[in-house]
Amino acid sequence: MVSPLAKGLFQKAIAESGSLYFPCRSLSTSHHGEETAEDLGVTFAENAGCASLAELRNLPADKLVQIADTADSGNFYKKSDEIVDGWVLPDQPLMISRRGEQNPVSVMAGFTANDGSVVALLGYAADIPDTAEAYTAEIKKRYGDLADKFLRLYPATDIDGSFYNALRDRSFGWMSESWVRHAAAVGAAAYLYYFAHIPPEGHVLAPIPGSDRQRPNGAAHGAECLYVLNDLESSPLSAEYPPTEKDFAMAEIMSDYWVAFAKAGKPEVDGLPAWKPYRNSACSYMRFEDAHAHPGENLFPGMWELMDEDVNRRLALPGVGRDYYAVGVSSPVLVVDQNYKSD
């Protein structure tokens, strides 16, 4: 979407796991105190005992993988993801999109109701306070003038639910809606979806990492994929949790929309509710739940604005770092002085 090298090579895109709007590592400039990609490469080469690119290229593939996934190599495998190299990626993807310089193709993007569960597995749920008072105090300490907005969206009346929803919105929600917003801003057809249909295994209780509490799996990360593919019975869970008539109906509806978009760049299906394109004024979206498609406008009012300001502060404040999953009581302190100006 944001690489000039891909211009004219594709006409449409579907994103079901957010977008690359978190800060990427740069080739030769350090950000947030992290190593540059070149520094990582030097450490990796030293650990491999190679003094040149030619020597690295002569290493067997299995040896490269073995060396890459070690602490001595700076965990190269885990850190050498997308690199702003000035060629494939000329700048941070978020900044390219905010300037309207991305490839203007049709876009469909969205997220699930319990997308936050996959982020919780990274360890952030261990920080959830036990009381409403402690939760509120942590939010006020970390968010300052944004605390009231945060608490309206993620109240202390349901601490676990609020924390999971904040994880969802901070990552997949904000990223997905940002993607369609930026596409719409350059005149491309853009469509936002929200998957809240509970799959058969969604009622199973799952432990909250770092605690002795549990909550239902719900519509977890990736739960929409088998519905989109209309292939529910291929799930390894289908024997223990067989799909119901509602599940099959939901799969038929979603796959019809996705196929229509893949064919023509518009999810228009005869006999199904009209899926309006996202506009930054109306913020149209489609919610998939209980075997039906429900068109709506302005999903989670105030969420995108709060999370976008959260991003701006992380980018502007020194020492905050690039860990964008840390949200709520796990967030860095985002309090700013009166001279701060948002993008």
Q: Predicted segments — roles?
A:
Residues A291-D343:
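Tryptophan-rich aromatic "cage" segments
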